[in-house]
From Swiss-Prot:
GO terms for biological process: translation. This is Large ribosomal subunit protein bL28. Residues 1-28 are annotated as: Disordered. GO terms for cellular component: ribonucleoprotein complex; ribosome. Keywords: Ribonucleoprotein, Ribosomal protein. One of its GO terms (molecular function) is structural constituent of ribosome.
Amino acid sequence: MSAYCQVTGRKPGFGKQVSHSHRHTSRRWNPNVQRRKFYLPSEGRTITLTVSPKGLKTIDRDGIESVVAKIRARGEKI
């Protein structure tokens, strides 16, 4: 599962981890993304999306139909 939110587009952040002796090693901050199933009444089927908590709030606010329409308008296959 990739660390990418399909609703908000949130991706991992990259940076350095600094030890007590100030050695720098690469690391990444993964977003909190989970796979969730949503029911689309217009199509009569469920879809699975990888979403972050902010993406879930967006779905609650705007509705799953409009969010899926925006994702498909970007050219992403669901």
